[in-house]
Regions:
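Gly/Pro-rich, tryptophan- and cysteine-flecked surface segments typical
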Residues: 137-138, 150-151, 208
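Mixed-charge, glycine-accented linear interaction segment located at domain edges/termini
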Residues: 156-209, 213
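Hydrophobic, proline/glycine-rich low-complexity stretches
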Residues: 1-18, 211-216
């Protein structure tokens, strides 16, 4: 991916640092239990992703749960998140805009859009003296990080994902991300699961890779 576009003069959007791994197959109950050490909210939703030309991979567009149009701009990668022996993934910098979208009747998916069903468990953390602690969402702009464990259904196939998304002041995004990952990975994942860079990608990159595999 390549960074794209300058800041909009109208709005800065929401800046974030993110790491995500997406793996094939059903989510194992033991992994859900490992994640369940922390309080989490669970929701099911269906997002629809616009399938763009690979050259525009740094500009993903989706309709979130039929209620909001979201546009993200990739701002580059500041490096690798590494928890020795447990996880290694690409840190990605993003800027996101969200626009309300009225719900439509019917469940048809226009050409060029790919529906993705998600059952999401989301645990939220805030920073306290440089350490991550479980917390409810604070006021907008405060440093924090969401950890997300998601069961994915797409085109009749099962996948699962673990991701972290840090938001708040730009200077604290990296601290929030790494502190939350350190807390989450303080315990080994069940079954010796190790998350590697080969599975570390955004939803847009994953969808493009799946499409390439189908047409190979």
């Amino acid at each position: 991916m390549t960074a794209a576009f300058a800041d909009s003069p109208a709005t800065a959007g929401v800046r974030s640092l993110e790491v995500r791994w997406i793996l094939p197959g059903q989510l194992e109950p033991a992994v859900a239990g490992w994640f369940g050490r922390f309080p989490a909210q669970t929701e099911y939703r269906q997002d629809s992703y616009l399938l763009l030309d690979p050259a525009l991979g740094g500009l993903p567009v989706k309709v979130r749960a039929g209620r909001a149009l979201e546009v993200k701009v990739y701002r580059g990668s500041p490096g690798i998140l590494e928890v020795t022996g447990r996880a290694r993934g690409h840190i990605q910098s993003w800027q996101k805009w969200s626009f309300p979208r009225p719900l439509r009747q019917g469940s048809d998916d226009p050409a060029g859009w790919r529906p993705v069903g998600k059952t999401r468990r989301v645990a939220r953390f805030c920073l306290a003296d440089g350490r991550a602690v479980p917390a409810v969402p604070g006021p907008a702009g405060e440093p924090g990080c969401a950890a997300e464990l998601t069961e994915i259904r797409m085109a009749g196939q099962a996948w699962w994902s673990l991701g972290f998304e840090a938001t708040g002041p730009a200077g604290l995004l990296g601290t929030a991300l790494r502190a939350t990952a350190a807390l989450m990975f303080a315990h080994d994942m069940p079954g010796g699961t190790e998350l590697a860079t080969g599975h570390s990608k955004s939803y847009a990159e994953w969808l493009a890779a799946v499409a390439d595999a189908v047409h190979a």
